[in-house]
Amino acid sequence: MQIILLDKVLNVGGLGDIVKVKDGYARNFLIPTGRARRATAANKAEFEAKRVELEKAAAAKLAESQAQGEKLGGTTVKLTQKAGVDGRLFGSVTNGDIAEELGKQGYKVAKSQVRLPNGPIKVVGDSTVSVALHTDVVVDITVTVYGETA
């Protein structure tokens, strides 16, 4: 299906690009989330009329993400979980736990923005985690997990 992208989409294209994607991806994800529209003549004309406005909004969103990224960069998140004697956790630390703790520290981060490269953290110690604030802004933070013996 031919679509017009209304936002930058990772591995697909940028604002204003007319691209061909699988029908299901367009119908079930891109169009309902407002990231794209079908590439009809009417939608192309409407997009060109709103292009400047959309580019300003995208630039503002990028600037906001970069400002938040500068504040967030180098942040350390400290979490305490129950752990065994050998340092393995009973359970794990997930992206939701990290996003919740960042929220307590005053940062607005969704759990989908927290990227755990090796899956959930299951051991006590320091781990480096990426936070994708925007498709162009990815910040690394340190997560320190302390063990609490039961």
Swiss-Prot record:
GO terms under biological process: translation
Protein name listed in UniProt: Large ribosomal subunit protein bL9
Any Gene Ontology CC annotation: ribosome
Organism listed in the record: Variovorax paradoxus (strain S110)
Gene3D superfamilies tied to this protein: Ribosomal protein L9, C-terminal domain, Ribosomal protein L9, N-terminal domain
PANTHER family, A to Z: 50S RIBOSOMAL PROTEIN L9
Function field: Binds to the 23S rRNA.
Ranges in a coiled coil: none
Keywords: Ribonucleoprotein, Ribosomal protein, RNA-binding, rRNA-binding
GO molecular function: rRNA binding; structural constituent of ribosome
Keyword Ribonucleoprotein: yes
Cross-referenced InterPro entries: Ribosomal_bL9, Ribosomal_bL9/RNase_H1_N, Ribosomal_bL9_bac/chp, Ribosomal_bL9_C, Ribosomal_bL9_C_sf, Ribosomal_bL9_N, Ribosomal_bL9_N_sf
NCBIfam families: L9
Similarity annotation: Belongs to the bacterial ribosomal protein bL9 family.
Disulfide bonds: none
Keyword Disulfide bond: no
